[in-house]
Structure formats: C-alpha cells, structure tokens
Amino acid sequence: MAVKLKLTRLGSKKHPFYRVVAATDETRRDGRPLEFLGYYNPMTDPVEVKLDADKIKEWLARGAEPTDTVRALIKKHMA
C-alpha cells in the first residue's frame, strides 16, 4: 500500500477548490483520504495555499510520494 500526497477536487463547476490529502495510490481522486494536509484555491488573486508543514514532513518521512502538482506546491509555498 503506497501512499501519495495528492489533490482532491471540491467546489462547483468552473470554480475549483482543492484539498491536499494523503491517500493510498489505489484511492480514487475524491475517495476517502488517510489525512487532510491543507488546501489550494486557484481562483483567488493571489492564489491561496495553506499547508500543514509538520504533517507533510511526517508523511514524506514515512515514504509518501507527492504528485507533480503537490510537489510544486510544497516547493513554492513551504520554502
């Protein structure tokens, strides 16, 4: 059971809002996550991102692999 850090989509049509979650690689995009780690709102100006650095570092230490988009968010907003 590999764990990935990925985005789940919320919000209405054409107004996306995403949660950053830890979920197994077999879990559907909007399936039940293991833990919520933050959120990403691309519709605001500037873009609103809130990440729980402690939880993300804990999951990365356990071997969780972030998706490309989540990796970019971590790199940009946790640096």
UniProtKB/Swiss-Prot annotation:
GO terms for biological process: translation. One of its GO terms (molecular function) is structural constituent of ribosome. GO terms for cellular component: cytoplasm; small ribosomal subunit. SUPFAM superfamilies: Ribosomal protein S16. It comes from the Bacteria. Keywords: Ribonucleoprotein, Ribosomal protein. NCBIfam families: S16 (TIGR00002). Belongs to the bacterial ribosomal protein bS16 family. This is Small ribosomal subunit protein bS16. It comes from Desulfovibrio desulfuricans (strain ATCC 27774 / DSM 6949 / MB).
